[in-house]
Amino acid sequence: MIPFTKNDLASLFTPQVLDRGRQLLSAGKVLSREVVGDGMIGSVAGSHGEQYAQTLELRRSKNGRLLIGDDCSCYVGSRCKHVAALLLNHL
């Protein structure tokens, strides 16, 4: 797994999405997380108990910026609070 920091996450998500991700993490909504190569698969419960599946892959650009390819089964689909919670859980 490519190492990343809170600053990296701040470059990927809006402050609101990161805040909602922190709330999900604090509430124990990250149900599973598995590192697979340079990415993760996981499951995060939504605000109302729904269960959403996430897959993501991280890499660094030539200038060192963190890049993400992600997918979530929620209606947002990517760069959502569920993906943020999964990444925050890894820090």
For the regions a protein language model found, what residue spans apply to each?
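Long, low-complexity, compositionally biased intrinsically disordered regions
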Residues: 1-91
